[in-house]
Amino acid sequence: GGSGGGTYGSYWGTSTGAGTSGQGYAGGHGSDGYYVYTVGGGGGGAGGAGQSTNNTTPPRGGYGLSSTITGTAVGRAGGGGAYSNGQSAWSSSSDGGSSNGDADVNKGGGSSGNGNAGSGVVILRMLTSDYSGTTTGSPTVSTSGSDTILTFNGSGSYTG
């Protein structure tokens, strides 16, 4: 993804990961030296920057973006919630990871601590009259009104 990671500690002097323009936002700053705990900054999300902290509270990851391509609103690509060596973390508000936990699968969200980021997803939506039916892999095929929706959670292709 194009989002930046948060810093771990060193609130006043460490650069955060920068987001890629049009893809994601920067991570937040963490803190250390002021308190007993060292706290990371929240990871950037597709819809907003990761939060920073100057105390012992682990900040949230940046917001993801809501996608309605499948007909139902789903948050995707949220930044990972920050980790503290003394407290549990907050998660992103839109499918980011929490402390030492895994992000939601097939939503592309970030993680925190020792967790795994969410796997990606590719969604294609087209008029059913244009759908060729030629695919590889195992996409989920659904319809919504006059449209056909292909959801790839793994390897595959579509030929139109």
Regions found by a protein language model. Name each.
Residues G1-G160:
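Low-complexity, glycine/proline-biased repetitive segments and flexible coils/loops
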